[in-house]
Structures are given as structure tokens and as C-alpha cells.
A protein has these predicted regions:
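Short beta-strand "acidic-cap" motif of Rossmann-like dinucleotide-binding folds
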Residues: 43-47, 150-151, 173, 249, ...
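Short internal beta-strands
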Residues: 42-50, 227-231, 362-363, 382-391
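Beta-strand->loop->alpha-helix junctions that form or flank phosphate-binding loops
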Residues: 72-73, 109-113, 244-262, 312-316, ...
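C-terminal helical cap/extension that packs against the catalytic core
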Residues: 59, 375-434
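Nucleotide phosphate-binding/pyrophosphate-handling subdomain across enzymes
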Residues: 3-19, 29-39, 148-149, 279-385
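N-terminal leader/targeting and accessory segments in enzymes
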Residues: 1-110, 114
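Phosphate-binding loop of NTP-binding sites
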Residues: 34-38, 60, 76-82, 89-231, ...
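Residues in the short beta-alpha loop(s) of Rossmann-like NAD(P)-binding domains
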Residues: 26, 49, 155, 232-233, ...
């Protein structure tokens, strides 16, 4: 008998003729616009950019459907008398114009929140300051061998228009950022928090708001919910006190009686006296102890859904995700790695700790108001030459210089204007058996649209050499 999603059918009927505001014309909202338009919603779109900065693909939909639009400065002045407001992750939910509409009776939601509300199947959400994408990709890779899976959120494809394809036995896997979770009042069935450290403090009001946003991934679970958290991180460990359902810990450092641990170079599932070996470190292709943590998280999230043997097989074949310690090429005995995803000092520290070779490090980008002092010691320990660029160049240089003075050591630090100059400089100074690591410890927005564009530019310049 064919499955009928009653909740989806009710929504589809209800949205017909309703006034819908879509805030943010990112490419991910294109399927949302198409779907809501097909249902007969009266759509108005809003974006703080001018038209020439909006992707032509999505702007073509605005003109094709003859949608009302408001762009640029003061773009929300006409946000009035709407039934639904769909916000993109880059738009804060507490803007005065949005709050005024909510107080008037509008429903504030998002593509992700509607997926959680209307999907008829199990949902797994992954968040954290670092390791989200690798952990999400691993969970998806492990489960898709046995289940029909849908991958969405920060990676994969927008899923709102695909809810009609979902059946109760399927699984939705979502990578969720603090911006997506910010005003969320629904949680995933299984919630994974990889770790929490200061991040995006240029957007969030303070660190507590960032932490609270992350906590929404499990806050609304019932007693059947599962929360997978990092025992080695003080903040995620503390989340256990707020959990409504079952808590599953993973740890790289502690020998826990229950949960997923890394012991004797092996990832193990522990259930009191029963210990099941999943995979040995030598069989893992992705580098770094931080990736062992990501593997532990993925195993903890999927251990009730697949066997350890099925987990092992997928993990053995997993080669990682683009822009995450990605090998680019070897030239004259020097290996080049792209770690453009590293938008925080913690990410770069994890990258530095992944190599035994001496490193030429390229770092710097947009300033997120983070503390760069913690990165100084790992740089001095692993790096022969530091190349800095972007808004954070001076902050990184100053942090390292202070620590060099403390240790009475020296390190060559070179400031450059851009990625192209950084690659040329690294080519001139890197010696055989060294590696060049592009790990910015900063976001990309001072020079690029996103970290993907930044990483592609780095690879392009390296491959020109």
C-alpha cells in the first residue's frame, strides 16, 4: 500500500493562496521558491544584496514567476502582513522587522525546520564547531548502504521539495549550523554534537548565544531521542544534564564503560563488559586525531542502525571531504595540502597536529573576533615558515611573535597580499620533505564568497606551479 504523508498534504493545501516571505536569495532557496510557487503561494522575496550580486540562476526564477522583490538597503521595510516567513541561515531571526511580523501573527520558519516538521522518517542532525561535515558525510556514507537516505542542511541538496519522496523507513541526515539552529523549536531524533569552541562571534551576540543555538539540536527531543556528545569537550559533556532522552558519549581520551572510545589505536563500542572492535587507526585513510573523533561520533550515531562490520567497511573506504586536509599535489619533494575549511584557530591546530613533517603554513582571512593566542605554540612547534594574509594577518603574527619572545625562539613570518602571492612565496621557500599547508584559521569573506571558492583558488594556483 502506497504511503501517504498526511502532514505534508495538509501543509500543501494550507499554503495555497497564503502570503509567503522568503528572506535570502541564496541558491539553496531556489527549490523552495519553485515548490511553494507550484502550490499557489503568493511569494515575495527579500535580500540585502543588490540584484547584480544575486546568482542569475535564482534571479531567473524571480523574473519567470513575476515575484515581488525588495533588495538592498532597507530591504525589510515592506515585510508586512505575511502568513509565513522563511528565513535563510544568514538572516538573524530577531531583526525588528521580523519580530514585528511574528507579534502580528506571522509564522517564522525555515527550509530545515519544515523538513523536520513534515518528514515522515527518522532524522539525524549533526552540529559542532569543528568536524560537522566530515562526521555528517561519514554517517550518510555508513547508512546509505542499508537505507534510503537524504542528505541536506549545510551539505547535500535542499530537501524541502523532496519530502514527498520520503517514506517512514528512510533516514534524513542533516548538517546544521548555529545559524540554522538559532530559533529552531524542533530537534532531530538523533542529535550529534561534535564539540563546541568559540566561533562566529562576529555574528552571534556572545558565546552563550552560540552555545544555546547549538543546544537546540537536542533541546526539543522527547524521551525517545538520542543525544551523541563528545565526552572530552567540557561544554558538550555538560549538555548531558539538559538531555530529555538517551545520552551516548564518544571519547578519544577516556576509557568509558559505555559509549564509543579510542583505545589501543582502535575505535571500540563499549557496553559495560562487552567491547566490540570497529576499526584500527591503521585502516583509516583520513589523517589526524581529530578525524578519529569524527569517526567515533559517526559510529556512536549509527551503532543501533548498522553492524560494526558495516561501519568498518565504509570507514575503510572513506577518503575524506574536499577542502579538509585535502592532498593537492607533490612537487619537487614538497606535498601541498588544502585545509580551507579551517575557519578557526582550533581547526588549524588540529591540522598542524595531523602531520609529522615540518610545515610551511599559509594562514589568515576574515576576522571573526577570535583569540589567536592558542594557535601560537602549535605553530612554533610544527612550522618552519609562517605566511600570513588577510584581515587576521597581524593578529596571527602578533600572537606568534609574543610566544616566540616567551620561548626565546625565532620563526620566519612573511606577510602577503593574497592566495596567489602566498602560493608563489611558499614555492620559493619550501624544502623537500616539508609540506605546505593552507589552513587559514579564519573565514574567507574578506576575499572570497566562501571557503570552497577559497580552497579552489588555492588548488588552482598550486596546480599552475
Amino acid at each position: 500500500m502506497e504511503y501517504i504523508n498526511k502532514k505534508l498534504n495538509e501543509f500543501n493545501e494550507n499554503i495555497k493562496g497564503k502570503k509567503v516571505a522568503i528572506i535570502g536569495l541564496g541558491v539553496s532557496n531556489k527549490p523552495l521558491i519553485e515548490y511553494l510557487y507550484s502550490l499557489g503561494a503568493k511569494i515575495t522575496v527579500f535580500d540585502n544584496r543588490e540584484q547584480e550580486k544575486i546568482d542569475t540562476d535564482i534571479w531567473d526564477k524571480v523574473t519567470k514567476y513575476n515575484l515581488k522583490y525588495y533588495l538592498g538597503e532597507g530591504y525589510l521595510a515592506n515585510l508586512k502582513c505575511f502568513d509565513y516567513i522563511f528565513r535563510s541561515p544568514s538572516c538573524r531571526p530577531d531583526l525588528p522587522e521580523i519580530e514585528a511580523e511574528i507579534n502580528r501573527g506571522a509564522i517564522l520558519t525555515s527550509e530545515i525546520e519544515m523538513v523536520l516538521k513534515l518528514a515522515p522518517c527518522k532524522t539525524i542532525g549533526i552540529t559542532g564547531s569543528d568536524g560537522k561535515t566530515t562526521t555528517t558525510s561519514l554517517i550518510y556514507a555508513i547508512l546509505k548502504e542499508k537505507y534510503k537516505c537524504f542528505l541536506g542542511g549545510n551539505i547535500g541538496t535542499p530537501l524541502f521539495a523532496r519530502i514527498s519522496e520520503m517514506k517512514p523507513e528512510d533516514i534524513v541526515v542533516l548538517e546544521l549550523s548555529s545559524f540554522q539552529l538559532m530559533n529552531m523549536e524542533l530537534s532531530t531524533n538523533i542529535a550529534v554534537v561534535t564539540n563546541i569552541s568559540p566561533n562566529h562571534l562576529n555574528v552571534h551576540k556572545d558565546y552563550q548565544e552560540y552555545i544555546d543555538s547549538k543546544a537546540n539540536i537536542f533541546k526539543y527531543q522527547d524521551e525517545n531521542g538520542i543525544l551523541v556528545i563528545n565526552y572530552d569537550n567540557e561544554i558538550t559533556k555538560d549538555f548531558a544534564k539538559q538531555a530529555n532522552g538517551k545520552v551516548v558519549y564518544f571519547s578519544r581520551r577516556e576509557k568509558l564503560p559505555n559509549g564509543v572510545i579510542f583505545d589501543e589505536d582502535t575505535v571500540k563500542i563499549c557496553d559495560n563488559d562487552l567491547r566490540r572492535h570497529v576499526i584500527n587507526k591503521k585502516d583509516v585513510k583520513i589523517r589526524g586525531l581529530h578525524n578519529i573523533e569524527n569517526i567515533c561520533a559517526a559510529i556512536a550515531a549509527t551503532k543501533d542502525l548498522v553492524s560494526p562490520e558495516e561501519q568498518r567497511q565504509t570507514i575503510m573506504e572513506f577518503t575524506g571531504v574536499e577542502h579538509r586536509l585535502e592532498f593537492v599535489r607533490e612537487l619537487d619533494g614538497v606535498k601541498w595540502y588544502n585545509d580551507s575549511i579551517a575557519s578557526s584557530p582550533n581547526r588549524t591546530i588540529a591540522g598542524l597536529n595531523s602531520y609529522n613533517e615540518r610545515i610551511v603554513l599559509i594562514a589568515g582571512g576574515r576576522d571573526k573576533h577570535l583569540d589567536y593566542d592558542p594557535i601560537a605554540k602549535p605553530i612554533i612547534e610544527h612550522v618552519d615558515t609562517l605566511i600570513v594574509m588577510g584581515e587576521t594577518a597581524e593578529k596571527i603574527k602578533n600572537a606568534v611573535t609574543r610566544e616566540l619572545e616567551n620561548q626565546k625562539k625565532t620563526l620566519k613570518i612573511i606577510k602577503v597580499a593574497n592566495v596567489e602571492e602566498a602560493v608563489k612565496t611558499a614555492r620559493e621557500i619550501a624544502k623537500p620533505n616539508e609540506i605546505v599547508l593552507f589552513s587559514p584559521a579564519s573565514t574567507s569573506f574578506d576575499m572570497f564568497k566562501n571557503f570552497e571558492e577559497r580552497g579552489k583558488k588555492f588548488k588552482e594556483e598550486v596546480n599552475k606551479l
